[in-house]
Amino acid sequence: MKIVLLDAKTLDNDKRLDSLKDLGEFISYDSTPSELVYERCKDADIIVTNKVVFDAPLLKQLPKLKLIAITATGTNIIDLEAAKELNIAVKNVAGYSTKSVAQHTLTMALILLSQIPYYDAYCKSGAWARSDIFTHLSGGLGQMEGKKWGIIGMGEIGREVARIASCMGAEVSYTSISGNIQNLPYTHLPLEDLLKQSDIISIHSPLTPQTHNLINETNLPLLKKDALLINSGRGGIVNEEALAKHLKEGRIYFGADVLEVEPMKEGHVFLDTSLHARLLLTPHIAWAYENSRKVLIDKVIANIKEFLQS
C-alpha cells in the first residue's frame, strides 16, 4: 500500500503525519507543482492532499488510485463525478475548524475596533515616551457592546461567531445566500439590508457561483461609514479592486484571512501602503489554530484507517 502526501508544508510538516508509515509505504513532499503531480501519484494507492487539483483527465491516468484523503473540508479540488466513475473514494474532514475560524474572526474584528495596530505603532515609535500625559486616544476606540453584527453564511462557523458576538453584547443578524432561513434566535435580513444596517459584517460562505463577487462595486457603497468587513470565508467573494477603492477613500475597514488568489501576488492592490491603516491581513491561517490542526490530522488518519478496514 503506497501512500503519497503531496503538500505537507500546508500542514507545517506536522510530525503526527508520520504515523501514516504504519499503514504502508509513505512518501511525503513539501509541495507538488502541477507538472509533477502525475509522476508522484502514478503508483499511489492513497493520495493525501490539501490543494492539489485532480481533474478527470488526471484521475483517468491513475489506475492504482483507490482513495484521495483531503486535509480540508472543501472537495472542490477533485472532479467528484470522475472519481465516482473510476471507483476512487474521496474523504474530507468537516467541522474541524469551527472554533478556530470563529476565534480568528472575532480577533480581527476586535483588533480593528480597538485600533490595536495604531496604538502599538504609537508606543513603539517612542511617541508615548515623549508624551506629557499618561494616555493617548487619538486613534479611536470602538466597543463591541451595542454594535450590529451582520453574518453572511450561517453555517457552523457563522453560528459560532454569532454566539460569541452575542455574548459580547453585539446585536446579531444574518443573511442566507442559499435561501436557507433557519430557526435561529437572530434576525434574518436580505443582503442589502444587512449591509446597510451592520457595523460589523463577517463572511462565512463557501465560494459558489452565487457568492462569487458577492461584495462588489455595486453594494459596497451601502456599508456604513467606518463599518468593519471581515472575510474569513473564501477569497473571490469580495471584489478586491472595488474594496481597495473604498479603503483608499477612508470609508470602511477590512480584515481578510483569504484572498482570491493565494498566495498573495506581488503587486497586489492590498500592498499599497496608503490602505494599511484600514486593512488587516493574515495568510489563510484561521483554520489552523493548534487544536483544530490536531483534530484535522487525527481525522485524516482515521479516514485512511477506516477506508483500509472497509
Q: Which ranges hold each PLM region?
A:
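Short beta->alpha connector loops at strand-helix junctions that form conserved
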Residues: 30, 71-72, 88-99
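An anion/phosphate-binding loop that grips the pyrophosphate of nucleotide cofactors and donors
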Residues: 44, 62, 197-198, 226
